[in-house]
């Protein structure tokens, strides 16, 4: 049954995916007008002069900042958020969870170690990016390094943005921007190319919270990632999955079949040893199909389940809990989360603007982790069944690996459940599935968010 469902789904998606292959200019980057570094040691450095196109960064009902664009030139709009991460800008910019957001870096210098290649590993996963394309609607930085140095780098940040048809610019006092966002909360904003800000454009602000962003970043048809010699087969619901989540699972001995976010997973769960729900962008309220499918799954199956980030929120909603929008979210690589079962504190990587309201969890679930900075919920677990989820990212990339053991815990749950079966079931992907399904995401391309106002 699963093989036929997956093959039919893949065939239906092929036609619509064919029309989404074009790349579009949809992002803008800001750089500071401060003096740029003159050079670096260790290798020949490509040099590119900064762009001279003026641009403005406008926060709705807030201040206007002026700067210079670098990369492609295009007007964009989205939700302005900030990250305090010191490194990992290639991973952050390609993280599907940032879809629809203008990302402000508090680190004053961005681009000093360049941008790596799109090389893939032994599992056909991207080594250095979290998805094949830039995902955020735009970035704002204080200063951009036109000279870079790193052994993995193949191009500069500005070259990468231009190649991805992404417009960028200095400018701005990012301290003032972050202060505003911290006090007022995440806000709608836009980046406009041109000399002057036009107040008449205020109506064109796009609120990504009103858009089903998961639909845009999720694979349009199932695909498979084989772990050679693996005895486990996990169904992963793709709400905008990061490459390193896939890598953490397949490298630990689990082959994966990755499904679109709205796939009726409860209908094929018997053909898998576990179910995993990935991270993703936007408001979880738009994923009602996923919530319904997960609720049906837990009603009809005892299969082990794990969720991360948006996957955590959707799993919580499926059991009746509620989510809330945070004032400015948690986006950093150094956020402490307390394990309430052991009393241990883990330094975690986080990227989310919504959180689960722990007071609404049903009695058969309990809090697993709590944020030591703001007290928000960071995880939950079932009291008797092998179901748990985390708001933070145990796969990091970038960030600390303190909590990567959670992938091992999940796969231990999967193996234990498989061993407890009265009749052994070989759920490994068949040769038919390996031959028919794609080996990477299907039909996911950059889309200009401004076009969906």
Swiss-Prot record:
Q: Does the keyword Lipid metabolism apply?
A: no
Query: Might you name a Gene Ontology BP term for this protein?
Result: glutamine metabolic process
Q: Which PROSITE patterns match?
A: GATASE_TYPE_1 (PS51273)
Q: Does the keyword DNA-binding apply?
A: no
What quaternary structure, including any partners, is listed in this protein's UniProt entry?
A: Heterodimer composed of 2 chains; the small (or glutamine) chain promotes the hydrolysis of glutamine to ammonia, which is used by the large (or ammonia) chain to synthesize carbamoyl phosphate.
The entry assigns this protein to a family as follows:
Belongs to the CarA family.
Q: What is this protein called?
A: Carbamoyl phosphate synthase arginine-specific small chain
Q: Which organism is it from?
A: Hypocrea virens
Gene responsible for this protein: cpa1
């Amino acid at each position: 049954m699963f093989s036929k469902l997956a093959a039919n789904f893949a065939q239906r998606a092929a036609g619509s995916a064919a029309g989404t292959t074009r790349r579009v200019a949809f992002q803008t980057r800001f750089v500071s007008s401060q003096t740029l570094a003159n050079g670096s040691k260790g290798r020949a450095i490509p040099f590119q002069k900064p762009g001279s196109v003026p641009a403005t960064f406008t926060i709705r009902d807030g201040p206007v900042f002026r700067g210079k664009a670098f990369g492609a030139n295009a007007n964009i709009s989205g939700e302005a958020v900030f990250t305090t991460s010191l490194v990992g800008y290639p991973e952050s910019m390609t993280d599907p969870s940032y879809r629809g957001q203008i990302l402000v870096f508090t680190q004053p210098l961005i681009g000093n170690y360049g941008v790596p290649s799109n090389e893939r590993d032994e599992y056909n996963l991207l080594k250095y990016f979290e998805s094949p394309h830039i995902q955020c609607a735009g970035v704002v930085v204080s200063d951009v390094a036109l000279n870079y140095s790193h052994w993995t780098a193949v191009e500069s940040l500005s070259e990468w943005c231009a190649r991805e048809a992404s417009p960028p610019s200095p400018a701005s006092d990012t301290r003032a921007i972050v202060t505003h966002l911290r006090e007022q909360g995440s806000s709608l904003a836009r980046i406009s190319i041109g000399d002057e800000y036009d107040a008449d454009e205020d109506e064109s602000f796009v609120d990504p919270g009103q858009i089903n962003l998961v639909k845009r970043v999720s694979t349009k048809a199932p695909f498979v990632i084989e772990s050679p010699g693996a005895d486990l087969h996990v169904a992963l619901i793709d709400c905008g999955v990061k490459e390193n989540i896939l890598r953490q699972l397949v490298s630990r001995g689990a082959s994966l079949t990755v499904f679109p976010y709205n796939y009726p997973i409860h209908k094929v769960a018997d053909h898998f040893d576990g179910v995993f729900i990935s991270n993703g962008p936007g408001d979880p309220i738009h994923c009602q199909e996923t919530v319904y499918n997960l609720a049906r799954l837990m009603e009809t199956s005892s299969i082990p389940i794990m969720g991360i980030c948006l996957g955590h929120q959707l799993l919580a909603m499926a059991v009746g809990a509620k989510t809330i929008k945070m004032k400015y979210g948690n986006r950093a690589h150094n956020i402490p989360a307390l394990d309430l079962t052991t009393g241990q504190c883990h330094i975690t990587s986080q990227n989310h603007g919504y959180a689960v309201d722990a007071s609404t969890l049903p009695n058969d679930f309990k809090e697993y982790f709590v944020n030591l900075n703001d007290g928000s919920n960071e995880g939950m677990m079932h009291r008797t069944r092998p179901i748990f989820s985390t708001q933070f990212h145990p796969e990091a990339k970038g960030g600390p690996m303190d909590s990567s053991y959670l992938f091992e815990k999940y796969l231990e749950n999967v193996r234990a459940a498989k061993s407890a079966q009265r009749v052994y079931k070989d759920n490994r992907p068949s040769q038919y599935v390996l031959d028919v399904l794609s080996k990477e995401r299907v039909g996911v391309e950059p889309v200009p968010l401004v076009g969906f106002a």
